Amino acid sequence: MAKKSLIQREKKRHKLEQKYHLIRRSLKKKIRSKVSPLSLSEKTKMQEKLQSLPRNSAPTRLHRRCFLTGRPRANYRDFGLSGHILREMVYACLLPGATRSSW
């Protein structure tokens, strides 16, 4: 089980990312716009605004975690579980439609 502080930190990052998502996306869109090209000084101002946003609001700072154990590795997106928890739940028939493979 992961430390509770790490899980809370990840939740905080997720909230920040949701809060600043639209602002970050619009700034990036304006910087990369080829329809109405900006001057170099305008682009640097936009870049400074983008850099002034909180670091933890960037989507690359997020990390998927198992919602039962908080384990950050070997997560399956479809289930939101880590590999060993997924395996245990499949063996206990707690996931409908998932079966053990046999050949």
From Swiss-Prot:
It comes from the Eukaryota. It is found in: Plastid, Chloroplast. Residues 34-56 are annotated as: Disordered. InterPro entries: Ribosomal_uS14, Ribosomal_uS14_bac/plastid, Ribosomal_uS14_CS. SUPFAM superfamilies: Glucocorticoid receptor-like (DNA-binding domain). Binds 16S rRNA, required for the assembly of 30S particles. Its main location: plastid. Transmembrane segments: none annotated. Gene3D superfamilies: 1.10.287.1480. PROSITE patterns: RIBOSOMAL_S14. The keyword Transport does not apply. The keyword Transit peptide does not apply. GO terms for molecular function: rRNA binding; structural constituent of ribosome. Part of the 30S ribosomal subunit. It comes from Saccharum hybrid (Sugarcane). Keywords: Chloroplast, Plastid, Ribonucleoprotein, Ribosomal protein, RNA-binding, rRNA-binding. GO terms for biological process: translation. Belongs to the universal ribosomal protein uS14 family. GO terms for cellular component: chloroplast; small ribosomal subunit. This is Small ribosomal subunit protein uS14c.
